[in-house]
Amino acid sequence: MRRMRAPALLAPVAAGILVFASLAGCLTGCGGGVLSPDLVLVNGGEPPYPLVPTSTNDSNGGRIIDRLFAGLMSYDAAGNPSQEVARSIETTDNVNYRIALKPDWKFTDGSPVTAHSFVDAWNYGALSTNAQLQQSFFSPIDGFDEVSGGTSDGKPGRTAMSGLQVVNDLEFTVRLKAPTIDFLLRLGHSAFYPLPDIAFRDMAAFGRDPVGNGPYKLADSPDGPAWEHNVKIDVRPNPDYHGNRKPHNKGLRFEFYANLDTAYADLLSGNLDVLDTIPPSALPIYKRDLGDNFTSGPVAVKHSLDTPLRLPHFGGEEGRLRRLALSAAVNREQICKQIFVGTRSPSRDFTARSLPGFDPNLPGNDVLNFDPDRARRLWKQADAISAWSGQYVIAYNADAGNQEWVDAVANSVKNVLGIDAVGAPQPTFAGFRTEITNHTISTAFRAAWQGDYPSMIEFLAPLFATGAGSNDVGYSNPEFDAALAAAEAAPNLQESDALANAAQRFLMHDMPVVPLWDNISVVGWSTEVKNVHVTWNGLPDYENIVKG
């Protein structure tokens, strides 16, 4: 999923998927033709990129991609992995893997899912000239450096990774550069989904009308296409799917909303079946409104305040001091209580508290405490290097309930540091993310990361490793990279978690982004549906929702 997959209030990597989510579009059925009454109506948002698994790192697109494709592994609602397309995955050293596929899997165009479907897709995702946003997920594979533009002239020396070899139609081998503790776990992430041959003929066209092998497929109707941009996406069960996530409904309609208040009103009136993000205006009253029709709990979603290191005053030592000052100037606890009514928890590290291995008492995490005196002292030290002038502007997408908390953060910064700090709304998530991804945004911005698989490394490597696809601020620290590599090379998960936590000491010192809070998800539903559950990373368990 994303990548940073990341939602504003909720909704990752997959690969985050960045969890920068938004809800864009219009009202239920608006422009969507005749609504089939058996579709489960769920909220979503216009994907900012074509629906290609190796380049979908946002939560809007990620939730669709995960319905349309199936990988070697899949995750249940608790985040537990199990084999899906894979019949077996064998390794004796966490370096060399032999992967066998189950027979009789096929894409919705009728073509078979073969070893080449995986190997060709992974090579496409890794090749630098394809500029795929999830490229860094393939970095452990031997030969990645040669295809990713890692040669001296910055151009790929090869077009295929040497560590991938097709044995036959249903078997292939993978050789990694070094032991990678979470490689097996990441094989259910969207970056590793297979692609049919038709995709490579015209990837842009494929992204507009993807052909997958997952539990659902895009479903045109006599009155309109499955995907009406900025309106909705319809998916129906794939009759040829025989994996772990068999749908228990007759299809889903992802409705794109211009704001969460409208979505919440539709939920109450029965025009929406499931809403995965309660708007701030309804947080004090949703329990009264929904009765027993909601669920809540901590999920793997992290929110942060990001400032590109290339901006004036935010590079070098001056920038480090200013970011540390901003962290100390934000009253996280007050905002979590007053704006989010207890549905957020103040950050204690750079991952998420629901993940295995999370430690709320990391050395140095006092930099995440609200400390106005320290904030002013650090800002003054930065001014001694180069005097501050102008505004501190925080960009955000206005279609996902962000204004309240961005204004609160800006006011906290203004009151503590005595500078002019303001929020800057942008109308849609898609346009907002395009500026960030293209590195043309000229201000700070809100960000979020939704887990793609339950691993602390997955919250660290895509966002902070040098050159990673979701490293939107341009952070680079070779010492952090080395510490992260040590965590990935650990012989067991317990040691890996300890080393991942140790690697965060560099992040506490450098403060590449300002962690804000973790999600406590609240998902609400109408009386038309049942069996609604929230998954480990904050999304509804779509396949198991029952309507009628």
PLM segments and residue spans:
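Structural transition elements
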Residues: 345-382, 399-404
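Gly/Pro-rich hinge or "lid" segments in bacterial periplasmic/extracellular proteins
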Residues: 179-247, 251-253
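Long beta-strand-rich cores associated with HINT superfamily self-processing modules
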Residues: 523-548
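Surface-exposed binding/hinge segments that line
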Residues: 90, 130-197
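Extracytoplasmic/peripheral linker and loop segments enriched in polar/acidic and small residues
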Residues: 165, 324, 336-337, 419-433, ...
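Alpha-helical secondary-structure segments
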Residues: 113-123, 169-175, 215, 249-251, ...
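Extracellular/periplasmic solute-recognition and catalytic clefts
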Residues: 219-234, 253-313, 337
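N-terminal lobe/hinge region of extracytoplasmic solute-binding protein
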Residues: 43-93, 123, 211
